[in-house]
C-alpha cells in the first residue's frame, strides 16, 4: 500500500505525483479539499502501472488514472443523493470542476458501471 505525503507546493506547478521507486503519493498541501481529493485519486490510478514505459504510454496511463479518479469521486458522491435518479452529470462535473469532453464520457461510463 502506498504511503501518502504532503509537500509545500506554493512554488511549484505540480499538484501531486506518484513515485514508483518509493511507492509514495505526494500531494501539494496548498490545494483545496476538492483538488487534493482529485489528485489523490488520480495518483492512486498510477499505483501498479508499469511506469518504466511511462513516456511511451503516457496518454494511456494518464487516461487510466483520470478514470480511476472519476470512479472514486463517484463513489464519494453517489451516497449523497436521495435517489440514484437524481444523478446529474453536469452537477457532478461542476461539483468537482471537471471540464473536458473526455471527463464527461468517463463520468457517464463509470456511473453506468457503478449502478
Residue ranges and their predicted role:
Residues 1-115:
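Active-site hotspot residues in diverse enzymes, especially metal/ion-binding acidic/histidine motifs
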